[in-house]
Amino acid sequence: MDDFERRRELRRQKREEMRLEAERIAYQRNDDDEEEAARERRRRARQERLRQKQEEESLGQVTDQVEVNAQNSVPDEEAKTTTTNTQVEGDDEAAFLERLARREERRQKRLQEALERQKEFDPTITDASLSLPSRRMQNDTAENETTEKEEKSESRQERYEIEETETVTKSYQKNDWRDAEENKKEDKEKEEEEEEKPKRGSIGENQVEVMVEEKTTESQEETVVMSLKNGQISSEEPKQEEEREQGSDEISHHEKMEEEDKERAEAERARLEAEERERIKAEQDKKIADERARIEAEEKAAAQERERREAEERERMREEEKRAAEERQRIKEEEKRAAEERQRIKEEEKRAAEERQRIKEEEKRAAEERQRARAEEEEKAKVEEQKRNKQLEEKKHAMQETKIKGEKVEQKIEGKWVNEKKAQEDKLQTAVLKKQGEEKGTKVQAKREKLQEDKPTFKKEEIKDEKIKKDKEPKEEVKSFMDRKKGFTEVKSQNGEFMTHKLKHTENTFSRPGGRASVDTKEAEGAPQVEAGKRLEELRRRRGETESEEFEKLKQKQQEAALELEELKKKREERRKVLEEEEQRRKQEEADRKLREEEEKRRLKEEIERRRAEAAEKRQKMPEDGLSDDKKPFKCFTPKGSSLKIEERAEFLNKSVQKSSGVKSTHQAAIVSKIDSRLEQYTSAIEGTKSAKPTKPAASDLPVPAEGVRNIKSMWEKGNVFSSPTAAGTPNKETAGLKVGVSSRINEWLTKTPDGNKSPAPKPSDLRPGDVSSKRNLWEKQSVDKVTSPTKV
């Protein structure tokens, strides 16, 4: 017993270790080397099982040896039989373990298939959800199934979780089976001890037939051994017969107990199967209920999601409209700024035109001023020329007179005196001429500066005028000198400079001192001319530099004005392009918005058409009664029982009533006659029943309670029209009193009884739109389908 307890404790510890290992594995799913770890664990489990098996076999052999040693009187034949039985039992145990392994493999396969079938209905089920008690129960129910030979296959172990579950399950089942077998073995040993059997045989685990045969053989051998040991060998036949009878009774007793065990096992198996079926059925019902609840929750979530999307779409449309309004406002502001910019450019152009006009007027005034100044200068020059000519003539006349007088005096005395006098007169004359030239130059310079201040753009003309004047002045001076000195010749160089006059020998012969005096006089006369030429050149150079600078400034201003104009043109072109792009983008956005609206309308129309088609198909699929039209009882049709013909009639009547409000009275009379013809068609159906009419939803053109219409619409959208009863809507005020005597009133109205409330067909002059609608309501509340179809809701 101590050895048995030790083995059981070892098995319990091993199960605990395997359970802990399985729990640890369940939390280590992210291991990089999962396959290697699983393979190593399986290898260790196989080694552990083999080791336990060898230990059990060795322990069984040791137990047998101890029992044999305890029986000192047993002969060698009994020892041989025991050894042979032990070997046979070991082979049987190996075969039995193999059969159990195959049976367990088949059971695991069936369990896996069942789990896969359950996964098809509920994906949330996993292999790890199978509890240990259910596994043990399935093990007990699967042990009695038919055995088939199949090879072990480890190729199925693809998923890590399935592999670990199978390993742990097999270990648990094998340990449970061993515990059960050991318990049975203990019970059998106790029974044998109670029956006073001296020897306990090694019984094969879970083999009922082999165990019975072995017990019979052992009991017979024990009887023989005991007789040999005590030396009481008797050859009496009655005693042997008693022993045989006792053995047969014992065998029958064992058989009876085995049958009872079998019956109890069958009953237990049947009970377990029934419980399993009940459990599976309950689980299936629970799954179906959960699935239904999940579907309803999903539908509810989908409806909420749809409402949310619609709200988001409405919000988005509002945002887009707001952005479009802001964009339009921005475009208006930009257009306003562009208009202001154009106005500013026009004003600038206007100012530029005024400036050009002012410049032209100033140029014109400057030209007139120059013309006037030129005329004045010409007049002054003429007056001065006349004065100079007169003075020169006077001087010439005086010189001629002096010359004539000097010829008459003696050459030496008179010549000297005349030369001195001439030199003095020449000096005086040159001083006077120099003074006059300086005064003229000062006047001309002042006029030139004044003209330059008035308008610097016309310097070239002034320069030409001054050149002409300067050219005239030296010529006049030279002429005066030539008139006075006939011996000088006028020489002008190509660059406009005046050279000193070369002297010619006169015919009259003077003395030597007289010749030197004439040379000094000529040099004194040429010096002022050279100085005047230098000053003239300096003035010309300065005037040219000033004119070139002013001309460059004017050219630079013109270029700047041209650049500014180009920039303005570029800005205007860019602004125009921006406006065109904005306009193009706005048009594109408008087109996109229209396309989206068209797409939304088309989608809604397709959805409505689809719902109409589905409703029509559902109405057509409904079973029709086999009764004829004459035998059919009157029945209140609701939207779930309406037909296409009645729907078409209701649409026709609605259209006719809508048209009747704007047409002539003759047309109204025709509508009334059509209503009468429709009423006659339903007379037979109305007369066939006496039952009260349940309230109906009103027609689409009549006052309809909003809640009833909303309920009907929601039922048609959800598809519950044919499964759930329709909610009774609030009755109209017009139909409040039409619940009992409606059919009799309609019959009286149709038969044109004189005491009816209203005439069936009044004249067109008496007809009013209210009469038509009220009469229509009378028969429409009792007709087959007076409400709008679900497609109109």
Swiss-Prot record:
Annotated positions of the Phosphothreonine modification: 730, 753
Cellular component, GO annotation: actin cap; actin cytoskeleton; cytoskeleton; cytosol; myofibril; plasma membrane; stress fiber
Residue segments, region Weak actin-binding: 768-793
Annotated crosslink Glycyl lysine isopeptide (Lys-Gly) (interchain with G-Cter in SUMO2) location: 459, 645
Region (Calmodulin-binding): 716-722
Span list, region 3 X 14 AA tandem repeats of E-E-E-K-R-A-A-E-E-R-Q-R-I-K: 319-375
Coiled coil: none
Localisation per UniProt entry: Cytoplasm, Cytoskeleton; Cytoplasm, Myofibril; Cytoplasm, Cytoskeleton, Stress fiber
Compositional bias ranges of the Polar residues kind: 60-74, 721-733
Feature: compositional bias, Basic and acidic residues: 47-56, 108-122, 146-162, 173-188, 236-407, 435-458, 532-558, 566-633, 765-784
Residue segments, region Tropomyosin-binding: 564-621, 664-674
Tissue specificity annotation: High-molecular-weight caldesmon (isoform 1) is predominantly expressed in smooth muscles, whereas low-molecular-weight caldesmon (isoforms 2, 3, 4 and 5) are widely distributed in non-muscle tissues and cells. Not expressed in skeletal muscle or heart.
GO biological process per UniProt: actin filament bundle assembly; muscle contraction
Location of the region described as Disordered in the Swiss-Prot/TrEMBL record: 26-94, 108-407, 434-458, 492-640, 687-706, 721-740, 747-793
Region (Myosin and calmodulin-binding): 26-207
Region (Strong actin-binding): 653-686
Disulfide links within the chain: none
A single GO molecular function term of this UniProt record: myosin binding
The Sequence repeat ranges on this chain: 319-332, 333-346, 347-360
PTM (free text): In non-muscle cells, phosphorylation by CDK1 during mitosis causes caldesmon to dissociate from microfilaments. Phosphorylation reduces caldesmon binding to actin, myosin, and calmodulin as well as its inhibition of actomyosin ATPase activity. Phosphorylation also occurs in both quiescent and dividing smooth muscle cells with similar effects on the interaction with actin and calmodulin and on microfilaments reorganization. CDK1-mediated phosphorylation promotes Schwann cell migration during peripheral nerve regeneration.
Keywords (A to Z) from UniProt: Actin-binding, Calmodulin-binding, Cytoplasm, Cytoskeleton, Isopeptide bond, Muscle protein, Phosphoprotein, Repeat, Ubl conjugation
Pfam families: Caldesmon
Protein family (similarity comment): Belongs to the caldesmon family.
Primary role: Actin- and myosin-binding protein implicated in the regulation of actomyosin interactions in smooth muscle and nonmuscle cells (could act as a bridge between myosin and actin filaments). Stimulates actin binding of tropomyosin which increases the stabilization of actin filament structure. In muscle tissues, inhibits the actomyosin ATPase by binding to F-actin. This inhibition is attenuated by calcium-calmodulin and is potentiated by tropomyosin. Interacts with actin, myosin, two molecules of tropomyosin and with calmodulin.
Domains (record comment): The N-terminal part seems to be a myosin/calmodulin-binding domain, and the C-terminal a tropomyosin/actin/calmodulin-binding domain. These two domains are separated by a central helical region in the smooth-muscle form.
Protein name (database record): Caldesmon
Gene name of the encoded protein: CALD1
